[in-house]
Amino acid sequence: MRRFLRPGHDPVRERLKRDLFQFNKTVEHGFPHQPSALGYSPSLRILAIGTRSGAIKLYGAPGVEFMGLHQENNAVTQIHLLPGQCQLVTLLDDNSLHLWSLKVKGGASELQEDESFTLRGPPGAAPSATQITVVLPHSSCELLYLGTESGNVFVVQLPAFRALEDRTISSDAVLQRLPEEARHRRVFEMVEALQEHPRDPNQILIGYSRGLVVIWDLQGSRVLYHFLSSQQLENIWWQRDGRLLVSCHSDGSYCQWPVSSEAQQPEPLRSLVPYGPFPCKAITRILWLTTRQGLPFTIFQGGMPRASYGDRHCISVIHDGQQTAFDFTSRVIGFTVLTEADPAATFDDPYALVVLAEEELVVIDLQTAGWPPVQLPYLASLHCSAITCSHHVSNIPLKLWERIIAAGSRQNAHFSTMEWPIDGGTSLTPAPPQRDLLLTGHEDGTVRFWDASGVCLRLLYKLSTVRVFLTDTDPNENFSAQGEDEWPPLRKVGSFDPYSDDPRLGIQKIFLCKYSGYLAVAGTAGQVLVLELNDEAAEQAVEQVEADLLQDQEGYRWKGHERLAARSGPVRFEPGFQPFVLVQCQPPAVVTSLALHSEWRLVAFGTSHGFGLFDHQQRRQVFVKCTLHPSDQLALEGPLSRVKSLKKSLRQSFRRMRRSRVSSRKRHPAGPPGEAQEGSAKAERPGLQNMELAPVQRKIEARSAEDSFTGFVRTLYFADTYLKDSSRHCPSLWAGTNGGTIYAFSLRVPPAERRMDEPVRAEQAKEIQLMHRAPVVGILVLDGHSVPLPEPLEVAHDLSKSPDMQGSHQLLVVSEEQFKVFTLPKVSAKLKLKLTALEGSRVRRVSVAHFGSRRAEDYGEHHLAVLTNLGDIQVVSLPLLKPQVRYSCIRREDVSGIASCVFTKYGQGFYLISPSEFERFSLSTKWLVEPRCLVDSAETKNHRPGNGAGPKKAPSRARNSGTQSDGEEKQPGLVMERALLSDERVLKEIQSTLEGDRGSGNWRSHRAAVGCSLSNGGAE
């Protein structure tokens, strides 16, 4: 062990590291992946969602969120919140029941599982005898009634889940108590519905699948009323006063039954097929809700004409002569209607319809004419179009923030002004200290701006680039439009749209300057757009410039997709970010890197063929540079083609086999088997947890120029530094490629007074070839004080000190395998760190982050945050390149999660744990978005929502996960990620979302953002 101990162990530094670094997984943003159940508590005003992976999530007022995970990881099929209690019961698809409760600890509520139970039948009984189909929590909160496939209703006592066998309501007992004319064995089968009498807790309703419905007296164990339908029963609703039943059936009909002692076997008052007379699909659930105005609301799921609309996912609302079938683009999991919470109230008075679909949550305002949707403060459908890239910008100036919100508010005119109606609990989270933006690029050519300041991710504004190009779909087309005479009266609702007009529209890179309001976005087909924020609508032509990256090459032929056709005339753009120039790369390959310098008015872009520089003030191309190696023929077959020849694949496979045999023979004497992998395992033994281990560095093998796409541009970086000599600094552009080559160009940018008259000039000053030829993923210049250069315009806005231009500058080059510091302008090696402690470890993401001390307000350090392909995150000091801490963050098998990770400027990060969810984590003790909230069962809210909304979101569950090598370690929490990433289907879905179809000649975009540029301390 002695050789693994790092010499010079400094207790003072160790204490300082504990003040700076701490790893926490804090909150999951977005929509739960694969939801399977919905529940709601009218008294607590809390919404519950269960998923197929065994997770349950509770949501209340913005900022109130809880998360739990069943150990079995089985699908949640039902969720029931106990009336007036901070408790809920879940039913899983393995027929197990689980009791959860919200308990106050340390001043905040936590969701905990208390008990679990599986209903057992007598020995030799068929599994269907105890297979639960319906769960009814009694209003006493002491009993659960469990309907089963056998037709029996079992009774279980809470909270211990003790089965009360003497209270079982068997199908035989019901049969014996029916009149002679109703005693047909065929009327039983499974229990489809259980309802408690709205006014009398001693009566329950039991509905059987064959059409029989009975009202059972719990005290007298007798049938009070029975109703027999000729159609198979799907569900049933009991009106608030208990005088009317409404049943729905498999043929698309519903019936109204009077509950009266005058007739023991009444005929239905009314039987109706809403979308008849042609055959219709089943109505699976129906609600009949009374109002003070006298006319009820009829709300039901399904029932659409089978032949023409059988594939639609609809919920219909009928009231006062108005009928609308809300049409969802994904399957409806469940719905609930928010009504008067007081059980003693005379009327239901519904005010909101809450629908959980497979891919989104939709809330409809039932109080406003036209029934408009309500804007969501949380549970955003991040994947309404597949996410293709992300970009984070910290500390947004107030002026820009307000302008973005103003532009977004104009897009929300179709939303209701109702306050968010699900407002249970109290958020204890303090207001965020700054304004942060998370920008997501999507497959349909849109960029969405999210408020990522706190624990609630809220959509602020959506930018679409589709108007710039000629596509098959008219951007002005209104998909929600509905003809007056059209039947059924369908209305599209929700934002989820899984289809893209043209995958070439997909956004691959985003770069926003928060000081100037300039935005650059780049796409799948080589398009680079530069946009400027405008508070007014404008009609303008977008200037088009072509950048031929192969202008000096002969004999190359592009075999991939074609470029997008741009509109030639003026285009009308709404207030917000408006494009004014389009740079089209030729060949139209995926843009792999992007950098914007708003002070110099320059934008740089790179593809698998080369890179270029464009002056967006003069609207002219400065230069292009082809980086193709003669062996890079595959780069011309399309950005998605990765197919090697069989001969080459076999040759490289045999080479790898020989290398692995040789290296394994050489490694054997170094220690026992498995010793090299020790660094990747969690420190299980207490004696090793606090011991700092020195990494075992293996030799870096030089790569052949034929091993990969050497010309693939991975990173671009602007810097004002010493490039030619030590006496004069100048603007410069740096580019790093997949083949380990760094190009440096000196730039001559005219002063402001002559900026429009003189052209920007560029001259190649240096070309550096790394010996090991590993891909370059990051470039950074440090000033004379070894501090990263500030962002463009940051000094001009007095938000950063001027860089030290007196001392010598240093160049940091981060490749996949090592970090190397060079002196400038001579470019002589000064320091290096090999990131090779673990076999196969490669750098995937790198960013500069500022870590503030939690004890001293005025103390902080700049470090590198590094993510590897093994899912580890390391913090490396600047400029000495000393490893500080290492945490296990993402599972190494989660390739897509690693590819989607983005760091922030203050030591936080985001990555996708499913196609619809971001996991948020923090490496800093100071910048920690810590969600806390409180729910009290005594605080029953009966007020109805007014106008306005203030979204905020916060879970109270401990979400910390991973191994901390330094600092104070927190216990891992039960995060949803653990359940999702244990499912290979989820991993494949995320990977397909990020990477796309890699087939040759296909339009599917290569969505995984490859490489990460260090942009003057910003985050990408």
UniProtKB/Swiss-Prot annotation:
Pfam families noted in UniProt: LLGL, WD40
Biased composition (Basic residues): 653-669
Intervals holding WD repeats: 36-69, 76-117, 132-169, 193-227, 233-268, 282-324, 332-366, 388-464, 508-583, 592-653, 713-769, 778-830, 835-888, 902-925
Main localization category: cytoplasm
Ranges where the record places region Disordered: 653-689, 938-975, 992-1020
Biological processes, Gene Ontology terms: branching involved in labyrinthine layer morphogenesis; cell division; cortical actin cytoskeleton organization; establishment of spindle orientation; establishment or maintenance of epithelial cell apical/basal polarity; establishment or maintenance of polarity of embryonic epithelium; exocytosis; Golgi to plasma membrane transport
Consequence when changing residue 649 to A: Decrease of phosphorylation
Residue numbers bearing the Phosphoserine modification: 653, 965, 1015
Family indicated by similarity: Belongs to the WD repeat L(2)GL family.
Function: Part of a complex with GPSM2/LGN, PRKCI/aPKC and PARD6B/Par-6, which may ensure the correct organization and orientation of bipolar spindles for normal cell division. This complex plays roles in the initial phase of the establishment of epithelial cell polarity.
Protein name from the UniProt record: LLGL scribble cell polarity complex component 2
Gene name of the record: LLGL2
